[in-house]
C-alpha cells in the first residue's frame, strides 16, 4: 500500500490545503493528514477542533486519515510506515525552507518529500492570512470550506 502524509498546523484548514490533500489522495492509496501540536503556539482552534474540521471537509476522500502528532514528523512516518511526505509549494520562498526540511527528514529517516505546486488560485493563501483578514471583517468565504467559515466566524465572534 502506498502511503503519504500531508503535515501542517491547519489553523484553520484552507482551500489551498484541501487542494493539496485531494491531489495527494489521487496519487496514494492512503493519505494521513498530520495535525501538528505545537505547545509554544496558542492556536485559534484547539487540536481536536482542527481534526474534526479536517475530517469533515475530507470525508469525501475514503483514503484520508486525520491524526495529531507531537515531535518529529519522521517519527510519525516511521510509526505508520509512511515513506513519503507531500508538501504544497506556493512560491520560491516556500521551496527554500521546504528543501532544507526535506533534506533533513531524508537524512534522519530516508523518508522522501514530494513537492506539489499549489494551484495558482491559492498561491498567496495561508491560514495566518485567512485569520488576519477574517479578524478585521474581511470576506474569506472563497478561501475556506463553508464548514470552516462557519467555525471561524463563530470563533472570532466569541473572542
UniProtKB/Swiss-Prot annotation:
Substrate binds at residues 9, 41, 73, 87. It is found in: Cytoplasm. Homohexamer. The record marks 17 as: Transition state stabilizer. Gene3D superfamilies: HUPs (3.40.50.620). This is Phosphopantetheine adenylyltransferase. One of its GO terms (cellular component) is cytoplasm. Reversibly transfers an adenylyl group from ATP to 4'-phosphopantetheine, yielding dephospho-CoA (dPCoA) and pyrophosphate. Pfam families: CTP_transf_like. It comes from Streptomyces coelicolor (strain ATCC BAA-471 / A3(2) / M145). It catalyses: (R)-4'-phosphopantetheine + ATP + H(+) = 3'-dephospho-CoA + diphosphate. Belongs to the bacterial CoaD family. Its EC number is 2.7.7.3.
Amino acid at each position: 500500500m502506498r502511503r503519504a502524509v500531508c503535515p501542517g498546523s491547519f489553523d484553520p484548514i484552507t482551500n489551498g490545503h484541501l487542494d493539496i490533500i485531494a491531489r495527494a489522495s489521487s496519487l496514494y492509496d492512503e493519505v494521513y493528514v498530520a495535525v501538528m501540536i505545537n505547545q509554544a503556539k496558542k492556536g485559534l482552534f484547539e487540536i481536536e477542533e482542527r481534526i474534526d474540521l479536517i475530517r469533515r471537509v475530507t470525508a469525501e476522500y475514503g483514503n484520508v486519515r486525520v491524526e495529531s502528532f507531537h515531535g518529529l514528523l519522521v517519527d510519525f512516518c516511521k510509526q505508520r510506515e509512511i515513506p513519503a511526505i507531500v508538501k504544497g509549494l506556493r512560491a520560491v520562498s516556500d521551496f527554500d525552507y521546504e528543501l532544507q526540511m526535506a533534506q533533513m527528514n531524508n537524512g534522519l529517516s530516508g523518508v522522501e518529500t514530494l513537492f506539489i505546486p499549489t494551484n495558482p488560485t491559492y498561491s498567496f493563501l495561508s491560514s495566518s492570512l485567512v485569520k488576519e483578514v477574517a479578524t478585521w471583517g474581511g470576506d474569506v468565504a472563497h478561501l475556506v470550506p463553508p464548514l470552516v467559515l462557519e467555525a471561524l466566524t463563530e470563533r472570532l465572534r466569541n473572542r
